[in-house]
Every structure is written in structure tokens, then in C-alpha cells.
From Swiss-Prot:
UniProt-annotated location(s): Secreted
GO CC terms, sorted: extracellular region
Family: Belongs to the DEFL family.
Keywords noted in UniProt: Antimicrobial, Disulfide bond, Fungicide, Plant defense, Secreted, Signal
Superkingdom per UniProt: Eukaryota
Pfam families (alphabetical): SLR1-BP
Protein name: Defensin-like protein 153
GO biological process: defense response to fungus; killing of cells of another organism
Origin species: Arabidopsis thaliana
């Protein structure tokens, strides 16, 4: 009886890992940088554009490219791939 319960627990554990893996798949966020004028970022406009264009959410961050000015903010959109 003890072996049967251990096997059933192992089967349930494997099944739950498979279901969790399939559920997470496809929900890995992608990142896209949107162009903005005057090196400024309006959070509400960024959020609205990302929701409309990518069905995701946006946030304002400093640029990550070498030629970006230090004080400039850019809109980055996070959306499901």
C-alpha cells in the first residue's frame, strides 16, 4: 500500500509539472522599445500605446543603447510573445 501511494504522488507531481510548463509557455514577455519625441516619456501615453499596439503594458525607462543620452526616457512595451 505504501508503494501505491508513493507512485500516485509521483504521478501527480509529474502531471502538475507538465501542466504548469504548458501553462507558462507562450506567456514569456517580449520587450519592444517605442519611439518617443524629445527624449521624454509620458507614462499614460506609453501605457495606452502599448495596450493598443501590443496588447501589453508599458513603462518609461532610461535608454539602453550606447548612443542614448543619459537623461532621456524611452517607452518600453512588455507583451506576451
Amino acid at each position: 500500500m505504501k508503494n501505491v501511494s508513493q507512485v500516485s504522488v509521483a504521478v501527480l507531481l509529474i502531471f502538475s509539472i507538465l501542466v504548469l510548463g504548458i501553462g507558462v509557455q507562450g506567456k514569456v514577455p517580449c520587450l519592444s522599445r517605442m519611439f518617443n519625441k524629445n527624449n521624454t516619456c509620458s507614462f499614460l501615453r506609453c501605457e495606452a500605446n502599448c495596450a493598443r499596439k501590443y496588447k501589453g503594458y508599458g513603462d518609461c525607462r532610461p535608454g539602453d543603447r550606447p548612443h542614448d543620452k543619459k537623461d532621456s526616457l524611452f517607452c518600453f512595451c512588455n507583451y506576451p510573445c
